[in-house]
Amino acid sequence: MAEALLDTVLGKLNAENPEAPAYEVLETYTGKDLEYKAYEPLFDCAVDICKKQNKKAYYITCDTYVTLTDGTGVVHIAPAFGEDDANVGRKYDLPFVQLVDGKGDMTKETPWPGVFVKKADPLVLQALEDAHLLFAAPKFEHSYPHCWRCDTPLIYYCL
């Protein structure tokens, strides 16, 4: 987590005992120190796809578009969705994983096949919570593209 965001993200952990520190910093690293370090995926639905492409996945990448304005200073990269993510994916030769079909539905590799990607959001959060892998799920207000004709969410879909 970015040092500048510690208080914002973790500062309320001591709500029941405000006299106690909310958190303790045990070690400090730069983003570059963590580059290429492996991590365990939250879901394993893309593991086989990555293996078929003979590409390494699930390691830390770095890029300059990550900011300290909100969140944790850590972002998820999905090279199949979004220009910045696609650029980072090419830079690090990440596998191209497409778990959403052309209609915007989750694919059979996921736990939610056939569910529209935006309707899957609460299902994903619930699965993470059930597995005790969810720290928090704050709602962030941000602009999101919608169809000018029918006002449905658009998906940036790389082919």
Show which residues each predicted segment covers.
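Protease-associated
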Residues: 1-74, 83-86
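Residue patterns forming the tRNA-binding/recognition surfaces of aminoacyl-tRNA synthetases
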Residues: 18, 36-38, 65, 69-159
